[in-house]
Structures are given as C-alpha cells and as structure tokens.
Amino acid sequence: MAIHLPLEQPVILPPDPDDSAQQVAAALAAFQAGQSTASAYRGQLNAIAARYPTCLNAWAALGELALPDDVIAAYAFFRVGYHRGLDRARGSGWRGTQQLRWEDEGNRGFLRCLYGLMCAATAIGEEAEVTRIQQFLLELDPSNHFGLERL
C-alpha cells in the first residue's frame, strides 16, 4: 500500500554542525586518494561523530565504510543517523508529509543514512523494513536519486 504525501513545501535540513561535513569530505578524499588506510579513515570518522553526534554525514560515512563486511555495525551506524536525521527534520518543521529532496544538500546525509539502512536491512533479511524504507525514500525524494525500483 503506497503512501502518497500531499504536495507541500519541501523541507531543507540545516547543514551538519560547524565544519563537520567538510571534515568528513576531507577524510573521504584522503582515503580515496590512498593517503590514509581504512582504519585511519574509520578513526577520523569516529572522532568526528564523537565531537559532532548530530553530523549525519559522519554516520552515513561510517555505515558506508562498514558495508558489506560488517553489516550489523553498518545497520547500527545508519540507524543512529536515521534517528538523528528525524530529530533534525522535526526541528526544521517537517511534519512527516513534506519532501526532503536530494537536490537540497542539507538533506543528503539523512537520505544516505536512510538508503544505507535499507541496504543493511536487505543484507540481514528484514524484508518488511526494506519495503517501508524504499517507499519512504521514494516519497521523500521523488527524483529517485538512488535508482530504486518503484513499488
């Protein structure tokens, strides 16, 4: 059963605190360039998440790094980011009916956490959760940034 959100003004989440998103991006760039190991990258992300527990991009990056090798850790990281994102969305006036689109950069950490949670739920066989998250993602961001199959 599809839930169809009424057309309301989309919500744009405020950015991650201070320069935490930039710190995450810099750590990722160094890791991708081979300038740091996975362990060092994880340590940087852990430090950012500890300093800025509301940094959605840090939780998303931690989950993405954990997949596919440590699905349970990934699931936990994404779940924390998802709940932190819901808190931020509600604090920004989101009432559960507006879109949170990928095109708005402030929303990307939350959407990455939600997508990652769906991927981790798939890996552990949580079919009902996968379906709910997929439907939720498509309703939040109709542009379908993640290329999900429409239900």
Regions found by a protein language model. Give the residues of each.
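Start-of-helix signal in alpha-solenoid helical-repeat scaffolds, especially tetratricopeptide repeats
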Residues: L56, D104-N107, L111
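Structural register within alpha-helical repeat arrays
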Residues: L62, F110, L117-A120
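N-terminal alpha-helical interaction modules that lie
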Residues: M1-N57, A61-W94, T122-L151
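Solvent-exposed loop and edge beta-strand segments that line ligand/cofactor-binding
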Residues: A50, R101-G106
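Alpha-helix N-cap/N′ positions at the starts of helices
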Residues: A40-G43, G109-C113
